[in-house]
UniProtKB/Swiss-Prot annotation:
InterPro entries linked: Beta-grasp_dom_sf, G_OBG, GTP-bd, P-loop_NTPase, YGR210-like_G4
UniProt keyword Isomerase, yes or no: no
Pfam family, one: YGR210-like_G4
GO molecular function: ATP binding; ATP hydrolysis activity; GTP binding
Record localization: Cytoplasm; Nucleus
Protein's UniProt keywords contain Cytoplasm: yes
Alphabetically ordered keywords of this record: Cytoplasm, GTP-binding, Nucleotide-binding, Nucleus
Protein name: Uncharacterized GTP-binding protein C428.15
UniProt xrefs under SUPFAM superfamilies: P-loop containing nucleoside triphosphate hydrolases
Residues annotated for GTP binding in this entry: 11-18, 83-87
Record-level GO cellular component terms: cytoplasm; cytosol; nucleus
Domain OBG-type G: 5-274
Naturally occurring in which organism (per UniProt): Schizosaccharomyces pombe (strain 972 / ATCC 24843) (Fission yeast)
Length: 409
């Protein structure tokens, strides 16, 4: 993949984006270590949860990741998050922090659009009642496509002249324009292949250009729609409306403020709570647990939270946000090990120390390049030798040992 995955978080003011980021970056699995050299001011480290390979072999108690953590076979993998500021209608025209918003956006591999599904804030984040949050989803897409489309149309006559003069193919011509938005030749080729255009590039009209731009945005910026504030009484009707309009595979229901509240109580010793769980244990549930007694006010708040969120949806949904982003990016974990028999680097270090995320379709040879920076002499999996051209398959060829080539004298 060449570089670390970056997930951009967007959302209008008061959507709960900051609360969502706080919940994702305050995971108890955080150790202070992460495999990134520098973290810029508008970036943070979040933790995506996956099923760890240790659970397949009953080694949960011996799993000690170098980065993130693992608890009961659920592994937390650090991922870089980007706080994309300045989202208001008209951002593509420079309104608000529009220029910065769009410049930040181009670095992201995927987006999480945090939407206030309660309908209690308008397009600019001002308090109101009865606002339709599906409008926010539509205008974010329009802002991004307008930004890229306007830039492309402005240069189109020159693009066409150069395309004809150099006898370039459409992929190369478009890639020279889309590269500024973080595209690769493979992404640009995928855009054109998916549209099956018969018309030569030099004869494209505005409608064709719009189709190309829309498809580029769909492929380059896969977007999770995080419907936040599901704890609000007005949320249900809006969720139903959005579910009828949007691809359900992009939707995640969440209550970021509930997640932050529960984690804070857990840290303070009032409750036992694990991220992503529907269960909240208190002193009343386990008198010998050592938990602190709750005030009547806190008991009421927890009961309301359980009724509105946990019992209805199975969790606060926050942990599902990054999991959905990984799904849209087609990411799967690979576990490089020094020993495919005991999965440890040394007797005292624990098992499955390393884990990397790769795209579905990645080969063992490509993983070797990522891990070693070069080719391995041989690649060994749990079930024997693995060929360089063998595609990584979760549960079969995702635990790998790379035997190094000996340096030439």
């Amino acid at each position: 993949m060449g570089r670390d995955i970056l997930i951009g978080f967007v959302g209008k003011p008061s959507s709960g984006k900051s609360t969502m980021l706080n919940a994702l970056t305050d995971a108890t699995a955080k150790t202070g270590n992460f495999p990134f050299t520098t973290i810029e001011p508008n970036r943070a480290i979040g933790y995506a949860q996956i099923e760890c390979a240790c659970s397949r072999f009953g080694l949960q108690d011996k799993c000690k990741p170098i980065y993130g953590g693992c608890k009961n076979g659920v592994r937390s993998i650090p991922i870089q998050l980007l706080d994309v500021a300045g989202l208001i209608p008209g951002a593509h025209a420079g309104k608000g922090l529009g220029n910065k918003f769009l410049d930040d956006l181009r670095h992201a591999d995927a987006l999480v659009h945090v939407v206030d599904v309660s309908g209690t804030t308008d397009a600019e984040g001002k308090v109101c009642r009865g606002y339709d949050p599906s409008v926010d989803i539509a205008w974010l897409y329009k802002e991004i496509t307008a930004w890229i489309g306007n830039n492309l149309r402005e240069k189109w006559p020159n693009i066409v002249r150069r395309h004809i003069a150099t006898k370039a193919n459409p992929v190369n011509t478009l890639q020279s324009q889309f590269s500024g938005y973080g595209s690769t030749p493979a992404v640009t080729a995928k855009v054109l292949d998916s549209l099956h255009l018969d018309t030569p590039l030099e004869k494209w009209d505005d409608d064709t250009i719009e189709k190309v731009v829309n498809r580029f945005v769909d492929i380059k910026f896969p977007t999770v729609i995080a419907l936040n504030k599901i704890d609000h009484p007005d949320a249900d009707a809006n969720i139903s409306k959005i579910a009828r309009k949007e691809d359900p595979n992009r939707l995640v229901l969440a209550s970021a403020i509930s997640e932050v509240f529960l984690r804070r109580l857990a840290k303070q010793g009032f409750v036992k709570y694990e991220e992503g769980s529907e269960f909240v244990d208190t002193l009343d549930d386990f008198p010998d647990s050592g938990l602190k007694p709750l005030s009547e006010n806190l008991k009421t708040r927890i009961a309301d939270l359980q009724d509105m969120v946990l019992f209805r949806h199975g969790s606060t949904g926050v942990c599902n946000v990054l999991a959905k982003a990984m799904e849209l990016l087609n990411l799967i974990p690979v576990f490089p090990v020094k020993n495919v028999h005991n999965f440890a680097n040394s007797p005292n270090e624990g098992v499955f120390r390393d884990c990397i995320l790769v795209k579905q379709g990645t080969t063992a040879g490509q993983v070797s390049q990522m891990v070693l920076g070069g080719e391995a002499m041989s690649i060994v999996g749990v079930n024997g030798n693995v060929g360089e051209s063998d595609v990584i398959v979760p549960g079969k060829t995702d635990i790998l040992h790379f035997r190094l080539r000996k340096a030439e004298a």
